[in-house]
């Protein structure tokens, strides 16, 4: 079945027809055919995508990507622990909100939504507060489309002996990284982002020695990261509670298609071409990105809304959807913007068609 329109969003996103077709069969969660041949293969493939070094493992968690973030924050940080988190967008702020809900002390570094974190501020906080045990940062902050400097951030954190948590929700699978070489202890992502699967579960790729320290620390039964991992380890892919079988099988197919494309490097190149084609085309129509080009990620781009008095996002959105494209509203608190994603089953030719559709949808310029 074909899609009526292309989702130009940061996920859920447009998937291939073969990924969707993979969900047309039912699976028994007790069978080796599911647990060993699908779940365990996924777990192994994820680790290999994240690092070429040994010592890492992976665990899948039911729910949204935020559920996996909360599972990590709530399991990795002990009762005497304290978190430092960078908040330069909605998703960094969400990590701080999770810490508040879980009564975890939290130091928030807030450089603003259009700025990268100032590493000297992070350095000062870590040097002056020995109670901080863990640090967290979002790799691609899709509030704006900014790519944060995770290598420098992790280097500062490791120099102070901290456990590093990376929210790579919207970047893993689309931007090459080696989490072992970066010193990342826990990396979190989701099925419905750059791997190009469908929603239903997230996953955590972790240094096994750090994950084992999580035993008995969870603040939630269903979000107990260690217990979920231990169950999968002992029972060869078995989930503690009902797993999203169709989503898991679709993700397996999506991983195969990532390999067929040429791996993360090839996908990153496609996403980059999409993004550069998008920005050039939008500028030709008079739109300007929110961020300077050096801060852009290949994942999603924020554009300033037109200042014309007749412009309304909903009307613009509707005209684009009628032409087969769905874009995203803005999420920046101090600027009127909208966002266009570059990821999913989207190619440069699609972006070129989008630019033509946007030109036709600019109703406020009609004389």
Curated annotation (Swiss-Prot):
Involved in phosphonate degradation. Its EC number is 2.6.1.37. Gene3D superfamilies: Aspartate Aminotransferase, domain 1, Type I PLP-dependent aspartate aminotransferase-like (Major domain). Keywords: Aminotransferase, Pyridoxal phosphate, Pyruvate, Transferase. Its cofactor is pyridoxal 5'-phosphate. GO terms for biological process: organic phosphonate catabolic process. GO terms for molecular function: 2-aminoethylphosphonate-pyruvate transaminase activity. It holds the Pfam family Aminotran_5. It is an enzyme of class 2 (transferase). The lineage of its organism: Bacteria, Pseudomonadati, Pseudomonadota, Gammaproteobacteria, Vibrionales. Homodimer. This is 2-aminoethylphosphonate--pyruvate transaminase. The modification N6-(pyridoxal phosphate)lysine is found at residue 193. It catalyses: (2-aminoethyl)phosphonate + pyruvate = phosphonoacetaldehyde + L-alanine. The keyword Transferase applies. Belongs to the class-V pyridoxal-phosphate-dependent aminotransferase family. PhnW subfamily.
């Amino acid at each position: 079945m074909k899609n009526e329109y292309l989702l130009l969003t940061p996920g859920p996103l447009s998937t291939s027809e073969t990924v969707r077709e993979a969900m047309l069969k039912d699976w028994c969660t007790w069978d080796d055919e599911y647990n060993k041949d699908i779940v365990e293969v996924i777990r192994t493939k994820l680790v290999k995508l994240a690092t070429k070094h040994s010592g890492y493992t992976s665990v899948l968690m039911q729910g949204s990507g935020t559920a996996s973030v909360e599972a990590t924050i709530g399991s990795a940080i002990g009762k005497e622990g304290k978190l430092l988190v960078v908040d330069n967008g909605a998703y960094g702020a969400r990590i701080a909100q999770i810490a508040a809900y879980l009564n975890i002390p939290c130091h928030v570094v807030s450089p603003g939504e259009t700025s990268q974190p100032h590493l000297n501020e992070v350095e000062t906080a870590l040097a002056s507060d020995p109670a901080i045990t863990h640090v967290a940062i979002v790799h691609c902050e899709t509030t704006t489309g900014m790519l944060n400097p995770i290598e420098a951030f992790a280097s500062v954190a490791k120099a102070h002996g901290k456990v590093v948590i990376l929210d790579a929700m919207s970047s893993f699978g689309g931007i090459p990284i080696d989490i072992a070489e970066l010193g990342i202890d826990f990396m979190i992502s989701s099925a419905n982002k750059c791997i190009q699967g469908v929603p239903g579960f997230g996953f955590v790729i972790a240094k096994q020695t750090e994950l084992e320290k999580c035993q008995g620390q969870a603040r939630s039964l269903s979000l107990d990261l260690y217990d979920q991992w231990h169950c999968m380890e002992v029972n060869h892919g078995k989930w503690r509670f009902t797993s999203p079988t169709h989503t898991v099988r679709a993700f397996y197919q999506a991983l195969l298609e990532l390999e067929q494309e040429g791996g993360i490097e090839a996908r990153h190149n496609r996403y980059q071409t999409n993004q550069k084609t998008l920005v050039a085309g939008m500028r030709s129509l008079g739109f300007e990105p929110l961020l300077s080009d050096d801060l852009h990620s290949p994942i999603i781009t924020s554009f300033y809304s037109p200042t014309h008095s007749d412009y309304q996002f909903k009307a613009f959105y509707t005209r684009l959807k009628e032409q087969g494209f769905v874009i995203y509203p803005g999420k920046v608190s101090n600027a009127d913007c909208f966002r266009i994603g570059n990821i999913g089953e989207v190619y440069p030719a699609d972006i070129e068609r989008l630019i033509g559709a946007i030109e036709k949808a600019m109703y406020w310029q009609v004389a």
